[in-house]
UniProtKB/Swiss-Prot annotation:
Chain coiled-coil ranges: 70-102, 162-192
Signal sequence, start to end: none
The protein's role, per its UniProt record: Physiological suppressor of IKK-epsilon and TBK1 that plays an inhibitory role in virus- and TLR3-triggered IRF3. Inhibits TLR3-mediated activation of interferon-stimulated response elements (ISRE) and the IFN-beta promoter. May act by disrupting the interactions of IKBKE or TBK1 with TICAM1/TRIF, IRF3 and RIGI. Does not inhibit NF-kappa-B activation pathways. Associates with the striatin-interacting phosphatase and kinase (STRIPAK) core complex, forming the extended (SIKE1:SLMAP)STRIPAK complex.
One Gene Ontology CC term in the entry: FAR/SIN/STRIPAK complex
Subunit structure: Interacts with IKBKE and TBK1 via its coiled coil region. Interaction with TBK1 is disrupted upon viral infection or TLR3 stimulation. Interacts with CDC42BPB. Interacts with SIKE1 which mediates association with the STRIPAK core complex composed of PP2A catalytic and scaffolding subunits, the striatins (PP2A regulatory subunits), the striatin-associated proteins MOB4, STRIP1 and STRIP2, PDCD10 and members of the STE20 kinases, such as STK24 and STK26.
GO MF term set: protein-macromolecule adaptor activity
Organism encoding this protein: Bos taurus (Bovine)
Alphabetized InterPro entries for the sequence: SIKE
Lineage, uppermost ranks: Eukaryota, Metazoa, Chordata, Craniata, Vertebrata
Family: Belongs to the SIKE family.
Entry keyword set: Coiled coil, Cytoplasm
Protein name, per record: Suppressor of IKBKE 1
GO BP: negative regulation of hippo signaling
Superkingdom per UniProt: Eukaryota
Pfam families xref list: SIKE
Length: 207
């Protein structure tokens, strides 16, 4: 592709140089035509100002000046038309080369874009794999954290349940202890009353 682009650029450069040469040649012909017109005008003025002895020579010069510039101008006009036609053909050829160059550059840009996209994809593949691996690791860590959280929640719930059971047991033990103390107190009072009654009975029997 590079060779084709270089060839097109070289051809385009050559065409532009030829166009410049033709423009310069056309300008030179126009200048020559203007110079011939000035010479003819000067010869005519000189012919009208010559003395009588030079009138015949002057008329011959006038005839020659009329004839020669006409031929020269005709030839120059033909050359100018040929140059203009060649210039038009060169411009058409240059435009065709430009169109071909634009088409090639368009395809080249498209291919480069595809290569860049492929390169970016290739460059991004390791990063993507690392990202996927890292994401999988993070997901595993999140799963482990969730599992640990569930275990902790269950443990806390079990601790709460155990605490509640212990609290209930303590309350029950306190209640039973209180009841036992009351029973012991009642028993102690009953024994004391019985003891006192026995003492009183024994005292009365002695009397």
């Amino acid at each position: 592709m590079s060779c084709t682009i270089e060839k097109i650029l070289t051809d385009a450069k050559t065409l532009l140089e030829r166009l410049r040469e033709h423009d310069a040649a056309a300008e030179s012909l126009v200048d020559q035509s203007a110079a011939l017109h000035r010479r003819v005008a000067a010869m005519r003025e000189a012919g009208t100002a010559l003395p009588d002895q030079y009138q015949e020579d002057a008329s011959d010069i006038k005839d020659m000046s009329k004839y020669k510039p006409h031929i020269l101008l005709s030839q120059e006009n033909t050359q100018i038309r040929d140059l203009q036609q060649e210039n038009r053909e060169l411009w058409v050829s240059l435009e065709e080369h430009q169109d071909a160059l634009e088409l090639i550059m368009s395809k080249y840009r498209k291919q480069m874009l595809q290569l860049m996209v492929a390169k970016k994809a290739a460059d991004a593949e390791p990063v993507l794999k690392a990202h996927q691996s890292h994401s999988a690791e993070i997901e595993n860590q999140i799963d482990r954290i969730c599992e640990m959280g569930e275990v902790m929640r269950k443990a806390v719930q079990m601790d709460d349940d155990q605490f509640c059971k212990i609290q209930e047991k303590l309350a029950q033990l306190e209640l039973e202890n209180k009841e036992l103390r009351e029973l012991l107190s009642i028993s102690s009072e009953s024994l004391q009353v019985r003891k006192e009654s026995s003492v009183d009975t024994a005292s009365q029997g002695i009397k």
